[in-house]
C-alpha cells in the first residue's frame, strides 16, 4: 500500500460531547458561500441555508467570495444580501489582473472600483492569498505586501469605513523545501500548488513583516494569523482564528503537552 492511500482510523475511546448549537449568538466573520469552496449555497434554496444558520445559532454571516471578482460580488449581493439583508454581509475585492492593462494608474482605478462596490452594497474588502505571492505590476515585478503604490486602495477602504480581511502567506512549512524533513510533505503532495518554497517565492517572514508595516487607516483582519508581536505593534490589526484543521490538531495538542 502506498503512503498516500493510508487512511488510519483512531481506536482511542474518548468522551464525546455533541454541541449542535452555540451557547451564545454567533457571528461567522469568515466564510464562503460559493461553490468554489465546497459550500455551493449559491446553487441551493436560500431558505435551506437560513434554516441551517438558525439551527446552529448563527445570527450574522460574512461572505468573502466577492473578493474573487465583481461578477461574483453582484451575484451574491442579489442572491443573499437582497433577500436577507440583516443576515449577510458581502465583501468585495481587487482585480489584480487589471494592473497590466491599467499601468501606473492601477491603484487609483482599483480604489475607484472599491468605492463603486461599496455603492453596490459591499461592506468590506477581501484580499486573497495571491497578494504577496503571485500578483505582479505592469512591469512584471512581484508586488510586495507593503508596496506604497497601493495606498489609494487602503485609504479608500478607510474613508468608506470598510474593514479589510487580508490573507497573506500560509503555514510556514509550505515555504520550506519539499523534502523528507517537511512536516507537510503529505499534504503538499496532495496539493502541489500549496508549495511556496523560497526561492522563487518570497520568504515567509518577509511577507508577514510587510503586512505588519502597512499601517492602514482601515481596520485590517489578518486571516489565518500569526499573532502576538504584530498585534502589539499594530493597533489597527485584528485577527481571524480561521485555520487549517491539520494545523489546529497537531500543533495545539503538542503545545498543551
What are these regions (language model features)?
Residues 2-8, 72-196, 249, 254-256:
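Active-site gating/metal-coordination segments in enzymes
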Residues 37-41, 73-76, 176-183, 230-240:
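Histidine/acidic-residue-rich catalytic or RNA/ligand-binding cores of hydrolases
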Residues 39-53, 102-117, 234-237:
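Short, acidic/polar
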Residues 30-34, 167, 224:
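Histidine-centered divalent metal-coordination motifs
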Residues 27-29, 62-65, 91-93, 126, ...:
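Active-site neighborhood of phospho(di)ester-bond hydrolases with catalytic His/Asp-centered motifs
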Residues 3, 43-44, 50, 203-210, ...:
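H/E-rich (His + Asp/Glu) clusters that bind or coordinate divalent metals
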Residues 1-83:
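An N-terminally biased module of ancient metal coordination in phosphate/nucleic-acid-related enzymes
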Residues 29, 52, 58-61, 122, ...:
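Conserved beta-strand->loop/alpha-helix structural units within folded catalytic cores of enzymes
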Amino acid at each position: 500500500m502506498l503512503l498516500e492511500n493510508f487512511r488510519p482510523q483512531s481506536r482511542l475511546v474518548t468522551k464525546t460531547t455533541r454541541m449542535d448549537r452555540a451557547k451564545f449568538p454567533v457571528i461567522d466573520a469568515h466564510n464562503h458561500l460559493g461553490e468554489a469552496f465546497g459550500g455551493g449555497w449559491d446553487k441551493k434554496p436560500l431558505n435551506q441555508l437560513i434554516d441551517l444558520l438558525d439551527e446552529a445559532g448563527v445570527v450574522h454571516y460574512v461572505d468573502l467570495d466577492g473578493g474573487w471578482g465583481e461578477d461574483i460580488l453582484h451575484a451574491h449581493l442579489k442572491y443573499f444580501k437582497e433577500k436577507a439583508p440583516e443576515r449577510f454581509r458581502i465583501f468585495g475585492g481587487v482585480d489584480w489582473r487589471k494592473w497590466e492593462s491599467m499601468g501606473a494608474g492601477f491603484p487609483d482605478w482599483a480604489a475607484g472600483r472599491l468605492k463603486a462596490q461599496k455603492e453596490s452594497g459591499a461592506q468590506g474588502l477581501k484580499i486573497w492569498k495571491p497578494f504577496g505571492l503571485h500578483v505582479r505590476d505592469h512591469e512584471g515585478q512581484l508586488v510586495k505586501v507593503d508596496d506604497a503604490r497601493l495606498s489609494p486602495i487602503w485609504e479608500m477602504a478607510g474613508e468608506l469605513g470598510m474593514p479589510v480581511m487580508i490573507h497573506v502567506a500560509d503555514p510556514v512549512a509550505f515555504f520550506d523545501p519539499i523534502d523528507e524533513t517537511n512536516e507537510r510533505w503529505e499534504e503538499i503532495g496532495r496539493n502541489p500548488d500549496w508549495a511556496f518554497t523560497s526561492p522563487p517565492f518570497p520568504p515567509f517572514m518577509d511577507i508577514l513583516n510587510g503586512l505588519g508595516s502597512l499601517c492602514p487607516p482601515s481596520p485590517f483582519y489578518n486571516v489565518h494569523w500569526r499573532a502576538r508581536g504584530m498585534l502589539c505593534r499594530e493597533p489597527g490589526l485584528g485577527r481571524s482564528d480561521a485555520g487549517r484543521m491539520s494545523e489546529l490538531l497537531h500543533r495545539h495538542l503538542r503545545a498543551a503537552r
